[in-house]
């Protein structure tokens, strides 16, 4: 690493990412596992996206949001895993500060859109189950696009706030990050300037973002649960609970790992637990989402099968 001179002393030009494991003998195993996870995640999500685009019977609001979620999952894992695999191959751990902040921005952009999209999906289920007579008008294509556009706009603002807050900090050594990608807790820990204001800002933004999202999702599903319990058909009740259960599972995993990550802001000592949470955020979540949401869904399964075999739906 070549430090460069700044107005406030020596300012580091790059960070050293230690990765998941420091044992050289285990690096090939890590490479194969993460390459496999990456290919499975990208392949699964792109298959769902293609099915949603091609199959007429999947041209509904629920699958429109699932298609967008698939794009986000591919983006989220592509921000972190390919660069980690590249470092494993080249055995170079140095990452320029600019590249680190860029990774931070895009990671929080995709995760932020995911967060807001989960609200839209909960709202969609609320309308479909609790307001079925007005569902088609309240969840029109225009409304769907507006919800997705609003999700991107809010997430962009959130990611930009995080990135600007980190860019104002001074990093003058040490520059070793015990992680496999750049994220907030690790950068805050390495800063040689006061991080109190930045941490308060990030806590406030994170609390508003996560708190509002969770409150809206919980309120939606309280109404959904009450409506489902009033359904007389056992089959209809089972189908509704299956769809909502998949969404709630993803919500629990997503917010659970995200809240833990934010709670690590201000921590003076970061451990391997943070790497485990990082794996959940960047690899496990994007890989599980297609399985939880769609591969359990017979409509999606049959749509993907028809697409792979060259048969088209007549719907």
Swiss-Prot record:
Glycan-modified residues: 8
Keywords recorded for this protein, A-Z: Cell membrane, Disulfide bond, G-protein coupled receptor, Glycoprotein, Membrane, Olfaction, Receptor, Sensory transduction, Transducer, Transmembrane, Transmembrane helix
Disulfide bonds: 100-192
GO annotations of cellular component type: plasma membrane
Main location: membrane
Protein's UniProt keywords contain Disulfide bond: yes
Membrane topology, Cytoplasmic segments: 53-60, 124-143, 224-240, 296-315
UniProt key word NADP: no
InterPro entries associated with the record: GPCR_Rhodpsn, GPCR_Rhodpsn_7TM, Olfact_rcpt
Extracellular side: 1-28, 83-103, 162-199, 265-275
PROSITE patterns in the cross-refs: G_PROTEIN_RECEP_F1_1, G_PROTEIN_RECEP_F1_2
Localization per Swiss-Prot or TrEMBL: Cell membrane
Membrane topology: Multi-pass membrane protein
Similarity comment: family membership: Belongs to the G-protein coupled receptor 1 family.
Main function: Odorant receptor.
Protein name: Olfactory receptor 3A1
């Amino acid at each position: 690493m070549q430090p460069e001179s700044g107005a406030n002393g020596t300012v580091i030009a790059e960070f050293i990412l230690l990765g998941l494991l420091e044992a050289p003998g285990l690096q090939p195993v890590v490479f194969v596992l993460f390459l496999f996870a990456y290919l499975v995640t990208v392949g699964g999500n792109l298959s769902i996206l293609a099915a949603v685009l091609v199959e007429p019977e999947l041209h509904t609001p629920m699958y429109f949001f699932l298609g967008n979620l698939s794009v986000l999952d591919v983006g989220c894992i592509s921000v972190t895993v390919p660069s980690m695999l590249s470092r494993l191959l080249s055995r170079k751990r140095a990452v320029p500060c600019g590249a680190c902040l860029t990774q931070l921005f895009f990671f929080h952009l995709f995760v932020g859109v995911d967060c807001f999209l989960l609200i839209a999906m909960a709202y969609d289920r609320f309308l479909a189950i609790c307001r079925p007579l007005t569902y088609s008008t309240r969840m029109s294509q225009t409304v769907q696009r507006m919800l997705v556009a609003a999700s991107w706009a809010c997430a962009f603002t959130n990611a930009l706030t995080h990135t600007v807050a980190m860019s104002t900090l001074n990093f003058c050594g040490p520059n070793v990050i015990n992680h496999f990608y750049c994220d907030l807790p690790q950068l805050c820990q390495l800063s040689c300037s006061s991080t109190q204001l930045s941490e308060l800002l990030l806590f406030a933004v994170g609390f508003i973002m996560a708190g509002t999202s969770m409150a809206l999702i919980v309120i939606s599903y309280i109404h959904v649960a009450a409506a489902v319990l009033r359904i007389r058909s056992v089959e209809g009740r089972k189908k509704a609970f299956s769809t909502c259960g998949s969404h709630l599972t993803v919500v629990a995993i997503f917010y659970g790992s995200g809240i833990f990550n934010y709670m690590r802001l201000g921590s003076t000592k970061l451990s391997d637990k943070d790497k485990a949470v990082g794996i959940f955020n960047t690899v496990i979540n994007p890989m599980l989402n297609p399985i939880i949401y769609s591969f359990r869904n017979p409509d999606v399964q049959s749509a993907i099968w028809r697409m792979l075999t060259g048969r088209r739906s007549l719907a």
